[in-house]
């Protein structure tokens, strides 16, 4: 097999789109903590000195939206207007309504449950139509593709050296990107690393490049993967002072590839942040990852993509497919059988299995929803692997 070059990117928690994701999920967490059955579809947008929160929320709880916005901005590090927005002084606009009753009637009681109320897992219908995908690979311990894993780690390291004042001239906004050369379908070397980070205006460019390479890149990347041909692009425009919501308007749901698998598999188009778990865009995508990770952990294949489609108001998935990219150790039909016999992809079953009605979403709103070994996430567990091994 010829060598190929594959690339993934990530962004820091201070990227304007990620700021919006974190605000939306912080609001969701606050609501679901008080009212686990709340229906939340919370969107956020941001620009210079302004945050707007909008969407549809049905809940018995009360949360102070403005306080959550300011707290989230402050935790990220936006405490100075020069950075693009100041948590203490920014304007906040809210425009929130209840969930449409037309949608609610299909979610509260699915098509199947209306006909036969004997199965509790038929109760919830999917909150919308659409497709979701999950993916896992054995090329890293996290089950993520190496370019994405490294991009996330570099982005987190940027935030760490900023917050710990190792590089005290850094500002919150930043992006990372890694290109890996694959040989015979396995990572061989790193072709290129891109790091762009917001900074104070009086920083010497050459000093910044030296600092970022020493304190960020070489602290994360295995030097055995770097050779004399590896390219480093550090703030390649030469200047990144204007950033955050001042540099680019931010919007919830615009980093869906960063949130998932870095372009290594399909994506149904639905974002995660700000959505309660009755939305299959989120819950079923987490479940598809859970399945794929267990299938790979069981040794049924080296790579696995799992896809589901849903109809609004219907509990059972309309379709399910898998792709093992030619790495399957048994027939794919047998893997499908194993999935069907061990996993229930109806929304209520997913919510119960993964315990999704809890305030866990703010933590995954930056640096990826998957492969998070720093968190105890239910959809990252491989507790079905032993049961799946019997199909080998």
Curated annotation (Swiss-Prot):
Q: Where is the protein situated, by its record's location annotation?
A: Cytoplasm
The positions annotated for binding ATP are 15, 173-175, 239-240, 248, 254-255, 271, 275
In this chain, K(+) is annotated as bound at 43
Lineage: superkingdom: Bacteria
- Its Enzyme Commission number? 2.5.1.6
Q: Tell me which residues bind Mg(2+).
A: 17
InterPro entries tied to this protein: ADOMET_SYNTHASE_CS, S-AdoMet_synt_C, S-AdoMet_synt_central, S-AdoMet_synt_N, S-AdoMet_synthetase, S-AdoMet_synthetase_sfam
| Renumbered residue ranges of the record's region Flexible loop | 99-109
Q: Which cofactor does it need?
A: Mg(2+); K(+)
| GO CC, any one term | cytoplasm
Pfam family of the protein (one): S-AdoMet_synt_M
Which controlled-vocabulary keywords does the entry list?
ATP-binding, Cytoplasm, Magnesium, Metal-binding, Nucleotide-binding, One-carbon metabolism, Potassium, Transferase
Pathway assigned in UniProt? Amino-acid biosynthesis; S-adenosyl-L-methionine biosynthesis; S-adenosyl-L-methionine from L-methionine: step 1/1
What is an annotated GO biological process for this record, any one?
Answer: one-carbon metabolic process
NCBIfam families, alphabetically? metK
Summary of the function given for this chain in its UniProt record: Catalyzes the formation of S-adenosylmethionine (AdoMet) from methionine and ATP. The overall synthetic reaction is composed of two sequential steps, AdoMet formation and the subsequent tripolyphosphate hydrolysis which occurs prior to release of AdoMet from the enzyme.
Tell me which family the UniProt entry assigns to this protein. Belongs to the AdoMet synthase family.
Q: What is this protein called?
A: S-adenosylmethionine synthase
State the organism named in the record.
Finegoldia magna (strain ATCC 29328 / DSM 20472 / WAL 2508) (Peptostreptococcus magnus)
């Amino acid at each position: 097999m010829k060598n190929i070059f594959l690339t993934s990117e990530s962004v820091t928690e201070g990227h304007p789109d990620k700021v919006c994701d974190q605000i939306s999920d912080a609001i969701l967490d606050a609501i679901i903590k008080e009212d686990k059955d709340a229906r939340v579809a919370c969107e956020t947008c941001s620009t210079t000195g302004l945050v707007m929160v909008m969407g549809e929320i049905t809940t018995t709880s009360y949360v102070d939206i403005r306080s959550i916005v300011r707290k989230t901005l402050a935790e990220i590090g936006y405490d100075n207007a020069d950075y693009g927005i100041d948590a203490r002084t920014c304007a906040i606009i809210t425009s929130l309504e209840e969930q449409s009753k037309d949608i609610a009637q299909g979610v509260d009681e699915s098509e199947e449950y209306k006909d036969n109320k004997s199965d509790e897992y038929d109760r919830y219908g999917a909150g919308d139509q659409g497709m979701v995908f999950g993916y896992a690979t054995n090329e890293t311990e996290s089950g993520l593709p190496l370019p994405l894993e490294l991009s996330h780690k570099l982005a987190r390291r940027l935030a760490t050296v900023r917050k710990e004042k190792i590089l005290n001239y850094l500002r919150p906004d930043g992006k990372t990107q890694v290109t890996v050369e694959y040989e015979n379908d396995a990572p061989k070397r790193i072709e290129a690393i891109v790091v762009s980070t917001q900074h104070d205006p009086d920083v010497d460019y050459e000093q910044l490049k030296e600092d970022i390479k020493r304190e960020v890149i070489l602290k994360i990347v295995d030097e055995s993967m770097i050779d004399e041909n590896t390219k480093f692009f550090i703030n390649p425009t030469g200047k990144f002072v204007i950033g955050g919501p001042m540099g680019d308007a931010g919007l919830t749901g615009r980093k869906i590839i960063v949130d998932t698998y870095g372009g290594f598999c399909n994506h149904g188009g639905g974002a995660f942040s700000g959505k309660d778990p009755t939305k299959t865009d989120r819950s079923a995508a987490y479940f598809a990852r859970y399945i794929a990770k267990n299938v790979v952990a069981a040794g049924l294949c080296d790579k696995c993509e799992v896809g589901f489609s849903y109809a609004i108001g219907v509990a059972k998935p309309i379709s399910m497919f898998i792709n093992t990219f030619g790495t399957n150790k048994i027939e794919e039909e047998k893997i499908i059988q194993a999935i069907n016999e061990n996993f229930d992809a109806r929304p209520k079953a997913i919510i119960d299995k993964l315990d999704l009605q809890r305030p866990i979403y703010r933590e995954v709103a930056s640096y990826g929803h998957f492969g998070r070994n720093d968190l105890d996430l239910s959809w990252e567990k491989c507790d079905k692997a032993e049961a799946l091994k019997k199909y080998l």
